[in-house]
Amino acid sequence: DQTPGGNSSNMFNEMKFTAILNKCRFQDPTIFPCWKVLRMATIDGARAIGLGDQIGSLESGKLADLIVIDIKRLNLNPVLFHPVRNIVPNLVYASNGSEVTTVMINGTFVVEDGRLTSCSEDQIRKEANEAAKLVVEKAAEKYHALNSKVAQMMEQHLI
């Protein structure tokens, strides 16, 4: 599998499914509240991979990594501030990533107005496909030797 269980490399999807699936699994609507899931995707995620001193939050001495989100997009509305705030729940449950207008990595803008500024999408796609082919070629023999249910289904062209 190339990505997490939901077959998506989209962090917004991962946040949503983390919250929803755990509520179902534990049959508890209070488990994994939105603020906690957002924290897991940022500060706690950085800490989990050993980079908490470099990324995960905006602090002096850390890399300036951030995204800007257009909260005027319909799927993120309505936006409430009083008596309750719903920006974090909107991000976790309703965002899909298309609302990201700006991305800064280590203080350098790499996406502005929703467009890549640092590289070409075609080049990224080409390099990703080339890298994937190399990985598959290296793993193919072991993959088939496992004779897993998924491998069998692929051999039968069922998936």
Per-range role (PLM):
Residues 1-75:
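His/Asp/Glu-enriched, well-ordered alpha-helical/loop segment
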Residues 117, 122-126, 130, 137, ...:
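C-terminal regulatory/interaction regions
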Residues 29, 33, 55-56, 63, ...:
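Residue-level signal for alpha-helical context at structural boundaries
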Residues 14-17, 44, 99, 105-106, ...:
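Generic recognition of well-ordered alpha-helical segments
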Residues 64-118, 125:
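C-terminal cap of metal-dependent C-N hydrolases
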Residues 6, 10-13, 32, 36, ...:
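Conserved active-site and cofactor/substrate-binding residues in soluble primary-metabolism enzymes
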